[in-house]
Regions:
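Amphipathic alpha-helical effector-binding/dimerization core
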Residues: 61-149
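N-terminal helix-turn-helix
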Residues: 1-79, 210
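Juxtadomain coupling helices with adjacent low-complexity linkers
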Residues: 149-161, 178-232
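A structural signal for short hydrophobic beta-strand segments in well-ordered beta-sheet cores
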Residues: 55-56, 103-104, 169
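A short, hydrophobic, proline-anchored segment that marks a local hinge/packing element in signaling
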Residues: 165-173
């Protein structure tokens, strides 16, 4: 988690709450554990952020990042076009696979989830929009780092019991603009998830890449996302 301190207490604590929720939904008690902030303060901050749409309550009552981050993120150059192009393919990928599908872009040494299509299963992978994850662990991170590898898989690598398959979304010059991923419980994905889900992921990545062809010709490159995403 980012531990940057600005000296403005309420801002620093609010960002600590946001960074904690970027790891996934959590209860008030879990927020206290993740941030080190007192229970009363963390609940007050989360409730205030909820009023502004930056935090929401998930179906089970836990706090999660709010959907306002989606509209804020879309103001970043090129990201709105990326999400618009990818969204129908994310939805199709989730429906065809029965699992959750995610779209990631690179930001420095991290990857940031910028869109999701969640599985209808009760037991499913949940990655919040705005979640910041390391590039080093998980298939999507490696797909962004090594676009020439094509299809990348992960089994219990980032989170025990979870498997994923990812592929880079390439621009016209082979630059990785983003990565698209499908993930779910190993019990359904199996320990060789590429065998069943790989073709679906590759088809989705290629379809989005084809739609984004005009972006690279207008000056958008994969590194243009680097360093411009907020840590939501």
């Amino acid at each position: 988690m980012d531990t940057t301190v600005s000296g403005v207490g309420v801002i620093d604590k609010s960002m600590a709450v946001i960074d904690a929720l970027a790891q996934g939904p959590c209860s008030t008690g879990e927020l206290v554990d993740r941030t080190g902030i007192t229970r009363a303060t963390v609940h007050r901050l989360a409730s205030a952020l909820e009023m502004h749409g930056l935090v929401r309550r998930s179906g089970d009552g836990r706090f999660a990042l709010g959907y306002r981050f989606v509209s804020l993120a879309r103001t970043i150059d090129g990201l709105e076009a990326l999400c618009d192009a990818a969204r129908p393919h994310l939805k199709t990928l989730s429906e065809q696979s029965g699992e959750s599908a995610q779209l990631y872009v690179r930001d420095g040494d991290d990857r940031v989830c910028v869109d999701v299509a969640e599985s209808a299963h009760g037991l499913r992978t949940i990655v919040a929009v705005g979640a910041r994850l390391t590039l080093e662990r998980g298939s999507a991170g490696r797909a962004l780092m090594q676009p020439d590898a094509g299809l990348v898989t992960s089994v219990g690598e980032r989170e025990p019991g979870v498997a994923s398959v990812s592929a880079p979304i390439l621009g016209q010059d082979g630059v990785a603009l983003a990565a698209i991923s499908v993930s779910g419980p190993i019990d359904r994905m199996s320990t060789a998830p590429a065998e069943r889900f790989g073709p679906l992921v590759l088809d989705a990545a290629r379809a989005v890449g084809n739609q984004l062809g005009s972006l690279t010709s207008s000056g958008l490159e994969g590194d243009d996302f680097d360093g411009h995403l907020a840590a939501g």
